[in-house]
Amino acid sequence: MNKICICGGGALGHVAAGYIAARSKAEVRVLTNHPERWSRSISVHTPEGESLIGSLSMISSSAKDVVTGADVLLFCLPGFLIKEELEKVKPFLGTDAYVGTVFSSTGFFFEALKILSPEQPLWGFQRVPFISRVVEYGHSANLLGYKSGFNITVEHVSDVEKSQFADWVADAFGRPVHLLRNYLEASLTNSNPILHTSRLYTLFSDWYEGVRYPSQFAFYDTWDVASAQRLIRMDKEFFDLLDVLPVTKGYLPTILDYYESHDAESLAVKLSSINAFHGLLAPMKAVDGGWIPDFSSRYFSEDFPYGLRYIHELGVEHGVDMPEISKVLSWGLSKTR
């Protein structure tokens, strides 16, 4: 794997490009809508105080320029851009190029399986490999935190090739890699698509045009029992789906297990007291007379159409009853159209 093309110029794209290039693990190219803002040299500042300097071989808005001849593609994009990017790169993909994503739970595999050749190698991280932040666009970024290891999935190649590719990812990203059973285990999660959407419905389902709130809500600090009850119901429906899918039993913990809780009351206490969540605010915007929900925020534009929707579609396909998820999804999609 000598040539990797990073697709997308966000924080993860900056860090992945700089980190891999600086460690000379591959020739790094970048596909971005703003090539004029990028330097051929990008610096990544690590938690250890290091400054890694990576040289990029090519930066372009033309997929033909940077995708042609690439051995690996890594999408660092929000869910709503994945379909468009797949269609953009498709004509220039080598038949043996591994096309992947930095985060699998925003619909990458569901779209790639529809758009790309059924033989095209696909891969993806279950969770993002880095916590990242842009310092100066196209020039520098902060790598704020690493995962201790990565769960990835690889599709449409032999078991031997999967293992070889996992070894390459471990070397390129500097952490051990565990191969998941299939793309479903990377794509289906009860984090953002369940956690966020259940809370948003509880906060805003009664809102209508003309209502003004006096202030912006805390998203987690005021997590209440009603929000926790809805989250538990949606999580139960999600696990009913997993029971009929070809996934490894227990590959994900339930919401109650993950947050070391036993009922809605204890879950509400737990979610409202996690230090890392303290101060995070609900997606709202200031208008004349107060505050209203911001339906253009990522909470809405990502987690409903590019998270919960795929869970619901699989439920329908497999005959799994999902009344709570159906209700929440229908409401959320009505706000994002």
Which functions belong to the PLM regions below?
Residues 207-215, 221, 225-337:
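NAD(P)-dependent Rossmann-like dehydrogenase/reductase catalytic/cofactor-binding core
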Residues 27, 57-58, 121, 178:
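Conserved beta-strand segments of alpha/beta enzyme cores
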Residues 41-46, 111-116, 164-169:
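Short, aromatic/basic amphipathic alpha-helical patches
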Residues 74-75, 79-141:
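Rossmann-like NAD(P)(H) cofactor-binding subdomain of soluble oxidoreductases
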